[in-house]
Amino acid sequence: MSEFVAKEMKVRLTFVEEVLGSSPSSEKIYSEYIASKAPDSLDTEDEIEAIGEEDRGVTVFPKQNGKPGVWDYQIKGAFKDACGGLSRVKTTESAKIKAYKKVIDKLIFVEPRFAPYQVNGKLGICERPLRTSGATGERTALAASETLPAGSSVEFTILLFDEKLEPAVREWLDYGKYSGFGQWRNSGKGRHLWDELDTDGNVIGGNNEYLKK
């Protein structure tokens, strides 16, 4: 353990709702998606042009060696989101942290750099309408995201440079039961439970009562 690391927490998140990918995809991936969904309605290039630049992306999961996963900074982003919400509740540990984004950036780290998902089944696609406002007025756009099935999980290690932050980190992990992870998380997508693991992978804490039994 590094001289700067005061505490390590090995964690497993198990998703009780499907997770939506949040990384922008390439236009090539989107073109293939359009062609597979509506091969006879319009020429693919025409349909891509008709959708408009702002509606063009399908958000996906980053992949290494063909396996979907999550980057360390995405997990830290989820911590910031949780801390920002919970800081409004004066009785929480999160409310005690001043300049919480800087604290998470500088004193909390996640390993490995890329954590692969353990996929429960197959990836899918979730389509949903989004209402947007612009110079031409309100319109409804189609958003699409790659999906990870409920029951999937991911493991990673949280490194704390200040062990006084541990209660807040546990609070953020507990918050995942109510507020999700990934794209469209405020709708409940990506809701999860968590286990704290020892070095042998045994469950020693967390809020996942099902896997503790």
Segments from the language model and where they lie:
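RNA-interacting cores
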Residues: 1-213
